[in-house]
Regions:
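Donor nucleotide-sugar binding/catalytic pocket of nucleotide-sugar-dependent glycosyltransferases
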Residues: 85-99, 104-121
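Membrane-proximal helix-turn-helix segments that form the acceptor-binding/catalytic region
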Residues: 67-87, 179-183
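Active-site proximal beta-strand in glycosyltransferases
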Residues: 44-71, 85-89, 110-112
């Protein structure tokens, strides 16, 4: 899927843990860098999620996408926090967690919420069934969702599952969830897609009614 990427982002640099990833953080980064003028790319180093290297001749913005207690943030509890001119959080809750758990002063950061390119107005395909969608990695509650299907006192629904670590280039991480994916494939109430390109995912979204996210 990386073959069609038309913009350079920090995560896709060689050696980065996310160098083969096209998850939500990478999609956000790609949209930012498409819109950002070269002037700002020259003046600032944008560090996304993990610190791989430091560019000494630039001001540094650290865009945080993970939980406060993720080990990658340990350097924020040391004088190394002064390496960064500004921290950017994706929600006020996340910033609060960094303040509560890591004692990061609020004035060190700004909140810029996650976003997507809006899906154009459209007509959903006519169907008698409610279309449910799960679109995330499997550890975020897919097992709970699959078990809950038998507790729903109705049959007029169909679940669409988009879930695989291959989206991040970590196909081997799917192995512990192989039985869960097989369960999805064998259930007539479910269609399992694995990981698909983002544009294909957006087309599917047009016909969905409910986001099923049980975690």
């Amino acid at each position: 899927m990386l073959d069609n990427v038309d913009v350079k982002i920090p995560q896709h640099e060689k050696g980065n843990l996310a160098e083969n990833s096209l998850g939500g953080t990478e999609l956000l980064s790609m949209e930012l860098f498409r819109r950002l003028s070269q002037e700002y790319k020259d003046k600032f180093q944008f560090i996304v999620s993990r610190v791989n290297d430091i560019e000494e001749n630039k001001r540094r913005i650290y865009w945080l996408h993970d939980l406060a207690l993720d080990p990658v943030h340990s350097l924020l509890t040391t004088p190394s926090i002064d390496l960064f001119d500004k921290l950017v959080f994706v929600s006020h809750w996340q910033q609060q967690q960094f303040n509560t758990l890591l004692k990061i002063p609020y004035e060190r950061g700004e909140v810029i919420k996650n976003a997507i390119v809006p899906i154009p107005k459209h007509q959903k395909s006519e169907t008698k069934d409610l279309q449910l969608v799960y679109a995330s990695t499997p550890q975020r509650g897919l097992d709970v969702l699959m078990a809950s299907l038998d507790l729903i006192d109705r049959t007029d629904f169909h679940l669409h599952v988009f879930s695989s670590y291959s989206l991040y280039g970590w196909k081997q991480n799917d192995e512990p969830y192989k039985h869960l994916f097989e369960k999805c494939e064998s259930d007539p109430r479910v269609t399992y897609y694995g990981a698909v390109p983002y544009d294909e995912m957006r087309n599917h979204w047009k016909n969905m009614h409910i986001l099923a996210y049980p975690s």
